[in-house]
Amino acid sequence: MLPVILIACLAQLVLAQADLKDLDGPNICKRRELYNVDVVYTELQSFQERGSTWCVTFPPRCSTYRIKHRVVNKTKTIAKNRIVRDCCDGYIASAGECVPHCSEPCQHGRCISPEKCKCDHGYGGPACDINCPPGWYGRNCSMQCDCLNNAVCEPFSGDCECAKGYTGARCADICPEGFFGANCSEKCRCENGGKCHHVSGECQCAPGFTGPLCDMRCPDGKHGAQCQQDCPCQNDGKCQPETGACMCNPGWTGDVCANKCPVGSYGPGCQESCECYKGAPCHHITGQCECPPGYRGERCFDECQLNTYGFNCSMTCDCANDAMCDRANGTCICNPGWTGAKCAERICEANKYGLDCNRTCECDMEHTDLCHPETGNCQCSIGWSSAQCTRPCTFLRYGPNCELTCNCKNGAKCSPVNGTCLCAPGWRGPTCEESCEPGTFGQDCALRCDCQNGAKCEPETGQCLCTAGWKNIKCDRPCDLNHFGQDCAKVCDCHNNAACNPQNGSCTCAAGWTGERCERKCDTGKFGHDCAQKCQCDFNNSLACDATNGRCVCKQDWGGVHCETNCRSGYYGENCDKVCRCLNNSSCDPDSGNCICSAGWTGADCAEPCPPGFYGMECKERCPEILHGNKSCDHITGEILCRTGYIGLTCEHPCPAGLYGPGCKLKCNCEHGGECNHVTGQCQCLPGWTGSNCNESCPTDTYGQGCAQRCRCVHHKVCRKADGMCICETGWSGTRCDEVCPEGFYGEHCMNTCACPSANFQCHAAHGCVCRSGYTGDNCDELIASQRIADQSENSSRASVALTLVLMTLFACIIFAVFIYYRRRVSNLKTEIAHVHYTHDTNPPSWPPNHNFDNPVYGMQAETRLLPNNMRSKMNNFDQRSTMSTDYGDDCNASGRVGSYSINYNHDLLTKNLNADRTNPIVYNESLKEEHVYDEIKHKEGYKDPDEYDHLDYSRPSTSQKPHYHRMNDAMLNINQDEEKPSNVKNMTVLLNKPLPPTEPEPQHECFDNTNTNLDNVSTASPSSSPKFLK
């Protein structure tokens, strides 16, 4: 019984420990506890060990002793400390928690803290065992309660238990400020001056705040108590949430923010001052200056940039023809030669220009958008260039002014108008980067290849690239006898009638031969193809075994297929008296009489031929692999029957050139390089030929294989019968001869490059460098007389107008001065006689010798602009002068005085005209180096860009095997598209057929005849009174 009790106590202890160990929640305390632990430790222990040793005694052994050490384990008990969790005093463990403990149980309540009960309603006393009616308490409930505000009195002591929100002995007081609830124990959490209700704790917020805890400001637009009032502020002004006073945003003022800042001020409180020029106001919020029309900038200091106008320069001028517009209102200010609201109307007619519209434009108007009404310069249509707009854009350029670079690849041309790529034959795609798909070729890859036997088609020309062992136009003919490989270019090395494989040249030996090249006979005892068969001859009775068919050569008096018998033919047996029944020259076994079949036969009586595919002795040899013939062979000899048009041991070769048909016994009759079909004899004509014998040239306007394609040449030009290439006149190019040479190129198919030595030349599409209009001479450096007179007349007319205006102004000033002078004389009552003196300059300035001079202001109007390859821009021949030359006479050495006048030309004007070059006749710059727009030309003389200009060699030799194919590499010679493109055929035909400008003999001396001319006449000269020329 005692052990059971001990076990139960131990279990209770364990459970209690487990319960304490799992305690959780409040009212748990920690304490230190001592406990014992048994530990095992080691110890070194000494001991004596007895032994024996030799000694002089009997028996001769003596004892010996020595001390040794050993390790032993021992156990001891030690005390340790540990921290344990346990319920604090007054609490006991229950269901894993520490709960209060009342020693006297609460009868009508519950224990809420150590030794304290919380009684149910209507009960009281330490143990909640007293119950009195409401309003009474004490022993026998004889005493009346005096609690206020719905408070409950304790039935035992009469103490008042106050309702929520009240306090005091009798619960007569509300909770002090900042507290609320039962026993006023809860603390208010209202913020920003808010007060809470003493019962519920609800916050009553101060003005300007809201929210359960008064922690939020009034929302925008609200203010006051409970944020119930609306703000009166305008323009996004904010009101003060407590008082409702408006706080204005920058740029606004007034009680309700209704007014902008006064002019000249801006920003928060309108305290910032504007700093704008031109009297411009500033923005009332940002202070940004609001510039008047025509001005811009942070402070309206800058005028509008070119081609802009209006407020903030936000409007774009829409004036045409480089006209400027008024910066304030956008009114167009037209350049000379233009009129209209937008300066879009020419003063002159479309083909006229000049001050009086008396000059005719030299532009090709079909390809010209504009002939400038003042200068006569041609503004070319998109895709056209040159001074007269007669040339399409040069290679690889397109678009307005030919400024854009084409992105076409692989020799393609591009449309000079929109840059669309016109692919060369064999290419496709937007930029011609994609090769034709297999099986297609030609322009736009529109043609289908007709190559056979695995041949590939060259995408540009459609030429068939034959695989090894094949040839002919369509790769439909095997290699001829004794040739093999790619293009049948290799020679076979097979001997002794061996067959040569046309693909790889391997040898197939005839029966009786072996070796890689069939150079060795079969060894003795072997025969047949590859010497694979063993001779069956009785070597005792035979002389030899034929290496070809295995036939035995018997000794004398011996016979039979294998030389096996000495009986006469047709008999067998011991006495050779039995008749042999074997057929087809077969023999009998001399003993048994069984048939020994001859080559090519089988069966009991040798009556059956070898099965298909076999032949020879005992039908053991297989027929050779036949390339172009019947699958079977002769059952006796193994010979094969080739298909029509083939020969060779294995029918591997077609008929030799010029032969066709069965056994290649028929003769071909094809002409002009036509190839004869080795099977049918039908002629396959080269491109450009037709007819059954290829003896007829393609009809007019047709070309190509079978004459199936039509020529597309313009102007009735002839096309080549082989490839359709048009034979163009000089100055034209393109597959249709419809493209004039681009700027800078000339001659046959535009193959020559212009390298004109000066700006007075122009590149003629047919003849190369020729003089520009208005120039003549070997070096094109002499003005034609009519051109010089016209230029001088116009310049003289301009000078006359200018001098007239100067004289009129001078005359008006003199009249005004005389009027003032005499007015003063009269007012002073004085009389004076005026003396006017005219002086004569007896020492006119020294003038350097000079033959003549040109004023080039208008001298370049009729010129064609040209981009030179390797030359500097030639300057005008106007020598810089400070005074006007009046040299005259036969040698231009005489000088004449012109009254008392000494006229000095404006130096800037002279320099301006002196430095004018052909790119801009009136450009002025202080530095002559800067004046040469084309001074740095990278391409030296003779340079040609291989990526742009490939020269086509029309005399390119043809190959022996493909004489009808020529690869076209020139970018200009690609087959043209039918797409719409700029056409200048009509005008350029006229242009190229025009005679070249006449060449006048070079004048030795040309001078103005100034002998009887004074300055007035020179200054006011008209076209009718032009100075004469002296020769």
Swiss-Prot record:
Expressed in adult head (at protein level). Expressed in glia, macrophages and ectoderm (at protein level). Detected in glia around the mushroom body dorsal lobe and in glial processes infiltrating the medial lobe (at protein level). Expressed in adult brain glia including antennal lobe glia (at protein level). Expressed in the larval fat body (at protein level). Expressed in the ovary (at protein level). Isoform B: Predominant isoform in adult glia. Residues 25-100 form the EMI domain. Keywords: Cell membrane, Cell projection, Cytoplasm, Cytoplasmic vesicle, Disulfide bond, EGF-like domain, Glycoprotein, Membrane, Phagocytosis, Postsynaptic cell membrane, Receptor, Repeat, Signal, Synapse, Transmembrane, Transmembrane helix. Gene3D superfamilies: 2.10.25.140, Tie2 ligand-binding domain superfamily. Residues 17-800 are extracellular. Disulfide bonds join 29-88, 55-62, 87-98, 102-111, 106-117, 119-128, 141-153, 147-160, 162-171, 184-196, 190-203, 205-214, 227-239, 233-246, 248-257, 270-282, 276-289, 291-300, 313-325, 319-332, 334-343, 402-414, 408-421, 423-432, 488-500, 494-507, 509-518, 576-588, 582-595, 597-606, 664-676, 670-683, 685-694. One of its GO terms (molecular function) is phosphatidylserine binding. It is a single-pass type I membrane protein. The keyword Nucleus does not apply. Disruption phenotype: Embryos show no defects in early central nervous system (CNS) development but display defective CNS cell corpse engulfment. Increased number and volume of apoptotic particles in the nerve cord. Suppression of glial engulfment of larval axons which results in defective axon pruning with most larval axons remaining in the mushroom body dorsal lobe at 18 hours after puparium formation in contrast to the wild-type where most of the larval axons are pruned by this time. Failure of glia to respond to axon injury, resulting in severed axons not being cleared from the CNS. Residues 99-129, 137-172, 180-215, 223-258, 266-301, 309-344, 398-433, 484-519, 572-607, 660-695 form the EGF-like domain. Glycans are attached at residues 73, 140, 183, 312, 329, 358, 418, 504, 540, 584-585, 630, 695, 795. Residues 940-954 have a biased composition (Basic and acidic residues). Induction: By axon injury which results in up-regulation on severed axons with levels reaching a peak between 12 and 24 hours after injury (at protein level). By ecdysone. By detection of apoptotic cells. The chain crosses the membrane at residues 801-821. GO terms for biological process: apoptotic cell clearance; autophagic cell death; cell competition in a multicellular organism; defense response to bacterium; engulfment of apoptotic cell; larval locomotory behavior; neuron remodeling; phagocytosis. Residues 822-1031 are cytoplasmic. Residues 1-16 form the signal peptide. It is found in: Cell membrane; Cell projection, Axon; Cytoplasm; Postsynaptic cell membrane. Residues 940-964, 989-1031 are annotated as: Disordered. Belongs to the MEGF family. Receptor which is involved in the phagocytosis of a variety of cells including apoptotic cells, severed and pruned axons, degenerating dendrites, salivary gland cells, germline cells and bacteria. Binds to the ligand prtp which relocates from the endoplasmic reticulum to the cell surface during apoptosis. Ligand-binding may promote tyrosine phosphorylation mediated by Src42a, interaction with shark and subsequent activation of phagocytosis. Also binds to the membrane phospholipid phosphatidylserine which is exposed on the surface of apoptotic cells. Interacts (via the cytoplasmic domain) with shark; this is required for the recruitment of drpr and glial cells to severed axons and for the phagocytosis of axonal debris by glial cells following axon injury. Interacts with ced-6. This is Protein draper. It comes from Drosophila melanogaster. The lineage of its organism: Eukaryota, Metazoa, Ecdysozoa, Arthropoda, Hexapoda. The gene is drpr.
